[in-house]
């Protein structure tokens, strides 16, 4: 199956380091890679009039709706956590891959998640939503 924008390769460790760098506002292992304001700008909703993606049309490849989800620079951004009807934080940013892979970064909880699998299509089973619920249920104060 040939899917546009798929086929990127890397390691889960590298993906984790990338997420850690974004969580730390552009810094990793004491080295500044991106400016703090650049990361903040990437994670803002850039859709017109601060609309969510549902207002722009429903996603085809996702098992969850787009209500409360905006779009930043290269990633989806939670603009209203309650509207998403999932456990998440406003300001969280994330993206999923064609084979149900996913990452999310939640600055409020100081956490990131990288999930690798090969379940096609990603809309077949809500595995990412189940992972999200499980991850957030483990958080304690």
PLM region spans:
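Catalytic loop of the DD-peptidase/beta-lactamase superfamily, centered on the K-T-G motif
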Residues: 4-141
